[in-house]
Amino acid sequence: MNCKEGTDSSCGCRGNDEKKMLKCVVVGDGAVGKTCLLMSYANDAFPEEYVPTVFDHYAVTVTVGGKQHLLGLYDTAGQEDYNQLRPLSYPNTDVFLICFSVVNPASYHNVQEEWVPELKDCMPHVPYVLIGTQIDLRDDPKTLARLLYMKEKPLTYEHGVKLAKAIGAQCYLECSALTQKGLKAVFDEAILTIFHPKKKKKRCSEGHSCCSII
């Protein structure tokens, strides 16, 4: 069975012995766009409504080094109510994507305060990539007005690079699930991190990953 595009936890492809299952788990505050990120990539469609996630699973077929692999994409709930339940999806993870919204400063600060400590406590040896989401809202008038009212501003690419270095993330990438700008690069980097988890430092430039040795 070919699971490319739009498969979920009901897919029976995990029994396909010809493909190795790679596990990517997405974490971050609620409403930062984790589900949209996964659905836009897996189904090539942006979801119309926001529904808080408890747990969901998608799978896509990827080719790495001429071999096909199943990339399991695991969505998690960011709300505090699920702090005890969420880590149940962590075992056997190959890479984590830690997400924050570039128009939600609180979600940015919670990466270092909440999410990195949780991952280091539960899965200390698994690499993680830092992802800035919702970049299409950086220039959205309503979003800018809301941030201005709260005396805040959108987070810049440089903010993401700085945080990635501070937390020991392998890379910083940013994307929009709505426009799909940078979306494929996020999951390409996740796959690369699984197979080559330690990277040499690179000079960071906007729109490209900022990688560092962890």
Swiss-Prot record:
Residues that make up the propeptide removed upon maturation: 212-214
Induction info: Expression is regulated by the transcription factor ERG.
Keyword Metal-binding: no
Lipidation (S-farnesyl cysteine): 211
Gene Ontology CC entries for this record: extracellular exosome; plasma membrane
GO molecular function: GTP binding; GTPase activity; protein kinase binding
Motif (Effector region): 50-58
Post-translational modification: Palmitoylated; regulates localization to the plasma membrane and may be mediated by GLUL.
Chief location bin: membrane
Pfam families xrefs: Ras
Keyword Cell membrane among UniProt keywords: yes
Superkingdom of origin organism: Eukaryota
Membrane disposition: Lipid-anchor
Keywords: Angiogenesis, Cell membrane, GTP-binding, Lipoprotein, Membrane, Methylation, Nucleotide-binding, Palmitate, Prenylation
Entry's localization field: Cell membrane
Effect of mutating residue 30 to V: Causes constitutive activation
UniProt tissue specificity: Specifically expressed in endothelial cells in different tissues, such as brain, heart, lung and liver.
InterPro entries: P-loop_NTPase, Small_GTP-bd, Small_GTPase, Small_GTPase_Rho
SUBUNIT field: Interacts with the CRIB domains of proteins such as Pak1 and Was/Wasp. Interacts with GLUL.
Record family assignment: Belongs to the small GTPase superfamily. Rho family.
Role noted for this protein: Plasma membrane-associated small GTPase specifically involved in angiogenesis. Required for endothelial cell migration during vascular development via its interaction with GLUL. Elicits the formation of F-actin-rich structures, thereby regulating endothelial cell migration.
This protein's name: Rho-related GTP-binding protein RhoJ
